[in-house]
């Protein structure tokens, strides 16, 4: 259907940062929240702009009447959304911040001060109240004693300490001293062996989460502030190379991800962070099979080099020097016919404070150059200040400002559907298209040269299908195309890291999409002693069994919902 109606809890209240009751949470607050996001041109509007009736027209100024938008307060406890098209995954969007409520009276009283970096600039209706926010230092939350479900909030105080990665021993040191309840460990840090000796039974690896990272190429680079290239001929040669599929595949097969993972994880955990698809392989299932299994079955259509490939997490199915050399030989022949000069220089920038990533990128450089030969390909690593790195990559406002040939970016799902990942490369609206040097919606011959127009057609066909199994099958086709293109070369996920913790295993919420997963501290419990590996594995086994049953039930309910 196109109409979704939600009933709100009468017990839900707004509170100030001091814990004073301000007002009840009403359906009108959800209308106000979406209107505020639209008026302020929120960067997260892409999630709902084309989903909610009338919202796109309001955002683009075709109407100034927000009452034409498909979000209504039917009464104080009933909010209703009307969609432009069926979205079987709509319910999973509702946990995203773009649809969060906002009290109109409070918003008016704060004016331009609303939402500033000050706990008193917003209201709270959840389990915690923010008490302090000191940039690059600490964020502190206190339990909201008046929260409607306070009985399920087991921690009174939450402090999040800023960590820039420059002192890798700091997290473990603070855990050992009792300041932290959770600490990520860095096996290549100077103190790790000592920590490991004292905690050999207590180091546990976190679950891999739904955030996927992948290398991509800048297909239409315009900025060369940070480069090792010394001539226009070198720039042109690199541009020709990255547009060549055999060249991209050669890089893919020459990249030793296990060696890359070892730089932050150590040898014991080197593979525990590895991810091999943009869409996590277990994100959805299709007739009892994981999404990754179905994608693997489709790779036979793309050549013998993909035969028998396994896309499961925590192993590297790509690294293969023989395949890499064969693909490069094909690429070199094709590129030399176009007058390309070798070696191809690929600029890769990295934040100079991120020691683990510097080690990882140097490992990638070593594996690619040793397999393909430094007389053929050179990875030029540029260590930049945090400001320069951010401004030429993550924070760059346009594709033309992206100053690199290779970029390692990531994406996590906004909602429970493969499109949440795969649409990011849509040539009309892709969320990471700028990282490829392309502007969404603008004609670019480079996008067509690598087949992104064909890929976008596959996405559009998949999005027409509402039956979950058939829909996911079509998205598996699109993911298979993306693998073969090597435009996005998956490497790691978040999670999968060695930790010390006093958090009771699997007491925290879990979600593959939205904002109700590990970022929520409701239900979280602490224990006095450090969690042991044995405790963690037993809890994990029980949790996985319960999760499998829960997922099966949810999939059955979804199938009924869309019919």
Model-derived regions: residue spans:
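Short, well-ordered beta-strand elements
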Residues: 2-7, 30-33, 79-80, 126-128, ...
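Surface-exposed binding/hinge segments that line
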Residues: 3-10, 23-106
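A structural "hinge/loop" feature
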Residues: 18-23, 88-101, 216, 225-230, ...
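Alpha-helical secondary-structure segments
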Residues: 22, 27-30, 78-80, 156-157, ...
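Gly/Pro-rich hinge or "lid" segments in bacterial periplasmic/extracellular proteins
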Residues: 64-67, 76-77, 83-159, 170, ...
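Extracellular/periplasmic solute-recognition and catalytic clefts
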Residues: 131-145, 161-230, 258, 262-268, ...
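Ligand/substrate-recognition segments at binding pockets and active sites
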Residues: 174, 269, 306-414, 448, ...
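Detector for C-terminal structural segments
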Residues: 250-298, 352, 356-366, 396-563
